[in-house]
């Protein structure tokens, strides 16, 4: 389990290095502990593996002031575990259900047991700024547009494939639009007074 914890920690640290999430941002985690242990999703939930993943992933995110949502499995319609303050901050609707390893999954159950004041919410309303998918459980529905894959050097947590994504604001405008501060400043040069 120590290897799982270390891999999760490295993944979180690398994620935050590639995409420095601001305090108050929302991170979504989805995962299958069965896949982490080399089994097919849903066949071998493990609270021990779930705790190892969370022990690695949560500290770097929480130290940065990032809100974390942990997705439950399809038996709970992919509802998520969040802190009550996260639900309030993002206007999320609480639902009346408690996860357990066979309905919700081990990762959501472990998060519910670990969080200070956990609640289940139906959806993130596509407000997550970034996230990780451990084992191909699909988190895209929770991410803001536009999702951008992040390629991390940590490719697996245990035996589960690790996918990560950040998001960026939509690019708007037409032929005259610019998309970086540097481009904007260059365009301004023609409007600045010329020295005599």
UniProtKB/Swiss-Prot annotation:
Query: One short Pfam family name for this protein?
Result: DUF436
**Which SUPFAM superfamilies does its entry note?**
TTHA0583/YokD-like (SSF110710)
Question: Which species does the entry assign this protein to?
Answer: Thermus thermophilus (strain ATCC 27634 / DSM 579 / HB8)
What is the name listed in the Swiss-Prot or TrEMBL entry for this protein?
UPF0340 protein TTHA0583
Q: Which family does it belong to?
A: Belongs to the UPF0340 family.
Among InterPro entries, the record links this protein to: Antibiotic_NAT-like, DUF436
